[in-house]
Amino acid sequence: MITLNQIKDRKARGSKKKRKTLLTGYPQKKGFCVKVYVTKPKKPNSAIRKVAKVTIRLKNKRKNLIAYIPGFGPHNLQPLSTVLIKGGRCQDLPGVKYRLVRKHYDFQIAERFPRKNRRSKFSVKNEKLKAKKGTAVRIG
C-alpha cells in the first residue's frame, strides 16, 4: 500500500511540450543569407549538398537557421542575398529543417534542361501552355 509521503514525493505527470518551429504562424518567411556552403549527408548517402545559413526576423529578434538549396547545377546565392524560406526538412542532412523557394527575391535560377515533372516544386512554368499562348489566333 502506498503511504502519504510517497504520494507527496511523487512527481506529477505533465503534458509534453510541443516544439515550435521558427515558421510557426507563417507559411513562408523572408530572410537573408549569411553564409552559403556545401555539406555532406549522413552515413549511407554520399553527395555534396548545397545549404545556406539564413537570418530571419521574428518580432524584433533575429534568428539563424540552416536551409537547403534545391535544384541542380549552380545557383546565384551569396551572402546578403534576400531569399524566401518554407518548411520541409532534408532527410539526410542533420539540422536542416527548411528549404529555400526558387524564383523569389534574389534566388533566380534557370535550369539547363526542360523540367516536365514536379514543376510546381521548382517554380517552372508549363512549356505546352507557353507554346499555345504564342500561337493564339485572333478572330474578328
Swiss-Prot record:
Major subcellular location class: mitochondrion
Similarity annotation: Belongs to the universal ribosomal protein uS12 family.
Gene Ontology BP, a term: translation
Gene: mrps12
One GO CC term on file: mitochondrion
GO terms for MF: structural constituent of ribosome
Pfam families from the UniProt entry: Ribosom_S12_S23
Recorded superkingdom: Eukaryota
The name this protein goes by in its record: Small ribosomal subunit protein uS12m
Compartments (UniProt record): Mitochondrion
Keywords: Mitochondrion, Ribonucleoprotein, Ribosomal protein
Organism whose genome encodes this protein: Dictyostelium citrinum (Slime mold)
